[in-house]
Amino acid sequence: MTESDMSEQLRGDVDHPESGIDVVLVTGLSGAGRGTAAKVLEDLGWYVADNLPPELIARMVELGLAAGSRITQLAVVMDVRSRGFTGDLDWVRRDLATRNITPRVLFLEASDDILVRRYEQNRRSHPLQGDQTLAEGIARERALLAPVRASADLVIDTSKLSVHALRESVERAFGGEVVAETSATVESFGYKYGLPMDADIVMDVRFLPNPHWVDALRPHTGQHPDVRDYVLGQPGAEEFLDTYHRLLNVVIDGYRREGKRYMTVAIGCTGGKHRSVAIAEALAGRLQGGDELTVRVLHRDLGRE
């Protein structure tokens, strides 16, 4: 058995249910990566509910089965902090079975020494630690969840997995044929209003002549054809767009390898009305043709002047 086989133990082939909604119960040891797994499922298009009371899970499924519902994939994160956790999980499975739904159970675990290290790094106490030591809290939880682990459909040991490797494992198990898309926001802004707080990359286009000083263009924005043609017709504008587009493609590929699915590219000029708007629109148009990439344009400061 390879290391990959040891870290991912898939008990039998579990097909998607014919009921119209796919349900995954995400559970496992505290600190083993439940939150990361849930985030990956969310990025794959699953509707994720964290610590939903057991009696509400069936209600959520009913909503998913209702005509016109957009919920076709539901992931529920459950942890040991719920009273009667093991019994709750069994009850949920039986209840869903009466609706012809067989939920899959994803169980995350890690070795004791890795869990101890993670808790010490984050300076957090274990939910079952109480007055005991951290190691005793982990041992108590491991014993409590042993029956759940034994009946899980997929067990992933995250002891030797990076966050990115865990993401890949969950994507392989639950992504089907769907490839998670990267979402890019191209945001124009004005420097006089400050930098965008959510920007991953910032580019200054104040090297281009400012249409503000052209009387006929001043009242219009970078979305107006005359302003757009003026900005893009300046020496170096098209060369800049071509070069920056190639650079961003390299960055996007790197983000994908690192598991980053969202990015914001900010384009700035003085007031966020002319140059940055025209360049942002043109750049977004070039990015639109990228594989597995969704692009939206945001003009933060348009209309503020």
Swiss-Prot record:
Keywords: ATP-binding, GTP-binding, Nucleotide-binding. Gene3D superfamilies: P-loop containing nucleotide triphosphate hydrolases. InterPro entries: P-loop_NTPase, RapZ-like, RapZ-like_N, RapZ_C. GTP binds at residues 79-82. It comes from the Bacteria. ATP binds at residues 28-35. The keyword Repeat does not apply. One of its GO terms (molecular function) is ATP binding. SUPFAM superfamilies: P-loop containing nucleoside triphosphate hydrolases. The keyword RNA-binding does not apply. Belongs to the RapZ-like family. HAMAP family: RapZ_like. Displays ATPase and GTPase activities. This is Nucleotide-binding protein Mkms_2443. It comes from Mycobacterium sp. (strain KMS).
